Amino acid sequence: MSHESPGGVSVADVVEAVDGVDPERIEALLDPVTDNGVVTRDAIDATVSDTSKRLATAETRIELAEDAYEDAAAVAEPVADIPAVGARLDAFKQQLEDVESRIPELRPDLSTPEDIHRRPTEVYEFAVLIRETVSAAGDAVEAAEDLSIDIERFRSWLENPDRRYDAFAEDLDLVEESIDELEATIDGIPDGVDDPEYQWAAAAMRTRILSLLAADLRAEHRDLRVLADRSDDPFRTELGERLDGVEERVAEVESAIDDIADPAWKERFAEDLAALDEELAAFEPPVEWGAVERALEAHLPDPSTEHR
């Protein structure tokens, strides 16, 4: 039985007309276009207006990200040949292109028949489109704003040597902390932990990660010195001394992990270690540390799932 009112179809009408969709989901989708459970033309028009504003905001945020990139690229142009600078610019350009690729979905056709509020199936389809469009606009705003912030931080890093050195020192801190943790793990193998072979394999993999990160820091240290030389900025020599210490400690950890290895462990995990080595070989400075960590997580052995 139809529950159509002078204003339009009711939520119950739409639930009855649409098969295979949970009624609560339908009700939630229709909320923006209903008034007291009835679809109205005024509510639809208001929803279109609000959604259009969201879409305009999203495109504006993308334009601001484009402006931020262009400004940063102009500032970086004299030193863009330095890997630490050029690679960051390339990454931002790719991210900007990814954000710009969202623009077509920010331009949906939101026009509707004048009597759509009386058509239950079309009202539902329109409500789905609105939900998807609002979600796409929100995602685009978030992505564009995050990118703009990252680009502004890069520009500040580029223009302020202290910010560059502070960021490098923070990276050194992270690697030193990781070395501390790894040394403690190695000290507990093979007698102080359960599943020592798995602990050893994980430690061996983490050692490879630290070696890659130390090499990445060495490459960035060279780039920071070139930047300082070109801009006549003072250079923090103590950063190089700390990096020397990090490289020495990584070498010691590599030696220690090899010394405690049972030959059977090496044989058992040879393929896993080789697979990680192959993946890490594809990374070149400047390295995205998050991607390296994801590579490690993908290869770490799990004693709870492997046959023992």
Give a label for each model feature:
Residues M1-D146, L300, S304:
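Leu/Val/Ala/Ile-rich N-terminal alpha-helices, chiefly Sec-type signal peptides and the beginnings
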Residues A169-R308:
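Long amphipathic all-alpha helical oligomerization modules
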Residues A91, Q95-A228:
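Long amphipathic alpha-helical segments with strong coiled-coil/leucine-zipper propensity
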Residues V33, G37-T40, A74, D81, ...:
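Generic, low-specificity signal for short hydrophobic/alpha-helical stretches with a mild N-terminal bias
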